[in-house]
Amino acid sequence: MNKIYNEFINYSKNNFKRNLSWLDRDVDSPTHGSFDRNYWHYKITDFNSDILQQGIYTLIALYKENIPNSYNKLKLKKLILSVTKYTIKSYQKNSSFNEYYPNEDGYPPLAFISNVLGDTFIEFPEFLELKNIKKTYKEINLYLSKLTEFNASNQYAVGIAGLYKFLKFFPELKNNVNINFHLNNILKLQDNEEGWFNEYDGFDLGYLSVTLEALSDIYEISENHKIINSINGIIF
């Protein structure tokens, strides 16, 4: 294993429990599955910041043993399902997701949640067959497909990655999602000479790393040569 990967494993082993402390694991709690401790525990806010549901990635990494651990896999899977159900329920409540304030209906939480749900269902496709999950997952992505985001490329790229993952399960909805329209849009946001993507009229290395990861996910699914050319523009 290379040095960077070893450092990542080290960091993960030392910090994943801190991340899990944000999760409401009480099966009798009405907020069971929420990753927003400020909401369900401290009561600092009166709504769930849905974008924090991405904490599910830690659970999935533990389940797949990408982070070494000795946890019971069945218990981990139940926790992953609880987060998935709570995320779906959060959308059902308002037909949107919130991040910073109630009724925000923000693009970032919608995009990132679409993406994380796609990754979750790729690992656990059986979750899609549970009551209301498939229906709501479709609603989330059909709504997302109607939106664009030209000021923050990282958000748009993640949203498009979420749509590509959605189409793995529902290829018959490709025309409804208009995926090529979104793909062409995101590629136009890249600087042709230097390879960076627009973030509020400029360059941002941190956001660019998010865009790079999203484009890599898109390429893995689509194998579109335009994407690999774009990725090469970022790296080289």
Spans of model-derived segments:
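Active-site/pore-lining binding-face segments in mid-to-C-terminal subdomains
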Residues: 37, 41, 223-236
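Low-complexity, Ser/Thr/Pro/Gly-enriched N-terminal "stalk/linker" regions
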Residues: 1-51, 74-86
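Aromatic-lined, polymer-binding surfaces characteristic
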Residues: 45-69, 73-222, 227-228
